[in-house]
Structure formats: C-alpha cells, structure tokens
C-alpha cells in the first residue's frame, strides 16, 4: 500500500509533527513519526501573526518561508529516522499553521500559513495542501476534518465509540458501529490546552503545565467556572468549530474578578476543559441507544494526568482507552489524519463528512502540487 506523510502544526504553536502512514485498503497503519519544535523566535512570531490584525506582505512571506523550511526539515528527519526512500512517498499532506479560522463570519474564511509549492520544491515530494477551504466553500465549517480519519481507524463493529483530541482546542468525534445508518458526529467542544498553556506561560514561564501538576495544586473557583461556561459557544449545537480567535487570554482575563490566585485559575481552566467535553458528549449522544465502549484520548492533553482524571470524573460510565491499544501513539494521530487526507485527495475520494462540518455534501479536499 502507498506511503504518505502527514504534517501538522496545531494551535499550541509548539512545532511540526510529522507522521509516516501506510494508506489504502483497510485501516491506516502508523509506521513512524517525529517532532521538530519551533525556535522560540519562530513561535513568538507565529503567535504574533495569529493575534495581529494587520501584517505586511513582506512579513507574511518571511514567516511562510521559515515555516515551510521547518516543515521540510521535519520531512527529511522522518525519512532518515524511518529509513524510507524519498521516492517511496506518494504525497505529503500539509495542514499549515492556522492563523485565523472564522467560518461564521461574512464572508466565511479560514487561513492557514503554508506554501505547498515551496514545500514540494524543498522536499522533492508531491504535496497536498489547502485542505480546509473546499469544505468552507461548500457551506461547511472546514473543521474538524479528523473525524473522517477517526472513522477509518477506530470504528467498532458493535459499539458506539468516542475519540477525543486534546490539542490547543478539544475536538470530539462520535463513531457509530459499522453498518449502522447513524452519522459520524464531530465538533470542537472548546479550549483544551490552549488557555492552560498560556496561563502557565504567563505565571510560571513554562510552555505548559507538565502532567497538570499546577492545576492539581489549586482549587476550582466555581463562580469563575460559571462565568467561563456562560460563553454562548458551549451551549451551541454542532456543527461548530472554534480556535484562538475566540478563546484567548483576553477572553479569560475579561472574566476574572482580579482576586483569584493563579493556581486556582489553572485548576478552573482544567475543569472548564473537562466540563465542556462532558457537555459535548451530551450534545452528541441524542439517539445513542447503547453504551459507549471507549473514550480514546489523543493529542498532548492525553499525557495530562490531572485533566484525564477530571474528564473521567465527569464521564464515569465511559472507559478511557489508550490510543496505543489500537496501534497508534496519541501524539501523532492528528498528523496521521493529514497523511490520510492526502491519500483521499490522490485517490479522488472525499475527505470531509458533511454531517460533521455542515457542508452541502462530500467533497474532495485540497490541491495537489507535483514533486
């Protein structure tokens, strides 16, 4: 079966994830992966770009080039570490770096910093890029796209199953048993690591709260939690998607009284993530007549013991099942999704699920740039 590489840089802005995946008949097979962090300067520049309302074309081109060069480095490292010849790669699926996602604006738009033409030149491989905007053009949210991949990878024969991606934003996928007419449901439940990381950076100087230890040392501020959960996004029914343009530090600080201790705020942010995920499970469970047999956490938050404990406390009836049980690492699942989406594009097959994104129908996603 053909080999693909998926490249992902999420809202955490911590670097490039690259996954080598065999795609074709049957379940996608993970063969290897590597991560390449951004330099502190590139991280800060990308964050500033995400928050900027104005930027020069020259600055945009500089950052796009630096980003693509880092992606090419990740591809080269992955090929070297896995012993894979370059000519064995059918295509690279490149997500790019989201700098704004506004599917409900007029006009709707989503922008990912990327240059598939340059990436093809730098790697010598075909590249599939611009994977979100066709769904948006068809009236969809352009996100999340991973649920179609989750369905190919995790669908069970007899039970409903949940996949939970804990990146900067939390994405939930509900998978019906194979052969059932029920649709796959997927959407963003709200912030996962994004606000916790930003708060940790501000008060501890650390890029993230390792294992959730700082959050575990604090107490949940119930009044603050209620103010946070009062945001309309949480009660909105899917399809829906969100990002840094909605959930950012200013959003948080505007809801603080000024008397909260930093560690209590961190605990409350962790509880916000867990509570909004539980709300999401309720929102997607209408019509589910059988128990879920698994909740599969993936992404960086899958290593946050405190966060997983909070999620399990909210959803005691659903067993948390490690991603590794299905032959995948939780760290590389999202990059793997973009390898699979590249396969779908090369094969001329749809990559979106209209029931997930709200698009008018299934669409072949992305453009193909020859190597």
UniProtKB/Swiss-Prot annotation:
Entry-linked CDD domains: ASKHA_NBD_ANMK
Gene: anmK
Pfam families: AnmK (PF03702)
SUPFAM superfamilies, per the entry: Actin-like ATPase domain
Superkingdom of the organism of origin: Bacteria
Pathway: Amino-sugar metabolism; 1,6-anhydro-N-acetylmuramate degradation; Cell wall biogenesis; peptidoglycan recycling
Keyword annotations of the record: ATP-binding, Carbohydrate metabolism, Kinase, Nucleotide-binding, Transferase
One Gene Ontology molecular-function label: kinase activity
Family membership: Belongs to the anhydro-N-acetylmuramic acid kinase family.
Known function: Catalyzes the specific phosphorylation of 1,6-anhydro-N-acetylmuramic acid (anhMurNAc) with the simultaneous cleavage of the 1,6-anhydro ring, generating MurNAc-6-P. Is required for the utilization of anhMurNAc either imported from the medium or derived from its own cell wall murein, and thus plays a role in cell wall recycling.
Any one of the GO BP annotations: amino sugar metabolic process
Protein name: Anhydro-N-acetylmuramic acid kinase
Top EC group: transferase
Catalytic activity: 1,6-anhydro-N-acetyl-beta-muramate + ATP + H2O = N-acetyl-D-muramate 6-phosphate + ADP + H(+)
InterPro entries: Anhydro_N_Ac-Mur_kinase, ATPase_NBD
EC identifiers of the protein: 2.7.1.170
Record: residues binding ATP: 10-17
């Amino acid at each position: 079966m053909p080999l693909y590489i998926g490249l992902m840089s999420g809202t955490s802005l911590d670097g490039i994830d690259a996954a080598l995946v065999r795609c074709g008949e049957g379940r996608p097979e993970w063969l290897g992966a590597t991560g390449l962090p951004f330099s502190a300067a590139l991280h800060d520049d990308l964050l500033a770009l995400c928050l900027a309302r104005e930027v020069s074309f020259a600055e945009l081109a500089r950052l796009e080039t630096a980003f693509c060069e880092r992606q090419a480095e990740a591809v080269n490292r992955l090929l070297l570490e896995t012993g894979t010849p370059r000519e064995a790669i059918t295509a690279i699926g490149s997500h790019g770096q989201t700098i704004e996602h506004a599917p409900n604006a007029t006009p709707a738009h989503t922008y990912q910093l990327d240059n598939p033409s340059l990436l093809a030149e730098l790697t010598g491989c075909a590249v599939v890029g611009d994977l979100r905007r066709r769904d948006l053009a068809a009236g969809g949210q352009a996100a999340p796209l991973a649920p179609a991949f989750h369905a190919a990878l995790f669908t069970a024969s007899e039970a409903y199953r949940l996949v939970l991606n804990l990146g900067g934003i939390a994405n939930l996928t509900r998978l019906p048993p194979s052969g059932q007419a029920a649709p796959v449901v997927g959407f963003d439940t709200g912030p996962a690591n994004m606000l916790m990381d930003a708060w940790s950076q501000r008060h501890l100087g650390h890029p993230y709260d390792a294992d959730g230890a700082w959050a575990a040392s604090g107490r949940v501020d119930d009044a603050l939690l209620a103010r946070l959960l009062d945001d309309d996004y949480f009660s909105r029914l899917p399809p829906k998607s969100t990002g840094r343009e909605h959930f950012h530090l200013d959003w948080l600080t505007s809801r603080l009284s000024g008397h909260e201790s930093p560690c209590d705020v961190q605990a409350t942010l962790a509880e916000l993530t867990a509570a909004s995920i539980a709300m999401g499970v309720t929102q997607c469970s209408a019509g589910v007549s059988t128990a879920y047999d698994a909740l599969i956490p993936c992404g960086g938050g899958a290593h946050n013991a405190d966060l997983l404990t909070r999620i399990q406390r909210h959803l005691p009836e659903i067993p948390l099942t490690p991603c590794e049980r299905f032959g995948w690492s939780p760290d590389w699942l999202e990059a793997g999704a973009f390898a699979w989406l590249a396969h779908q594009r090369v094969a001329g097959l749809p990559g979106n699920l209209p029931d997930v994104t709200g698009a008018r129908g299934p669409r072949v996603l992305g453009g193909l740039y020859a190597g």
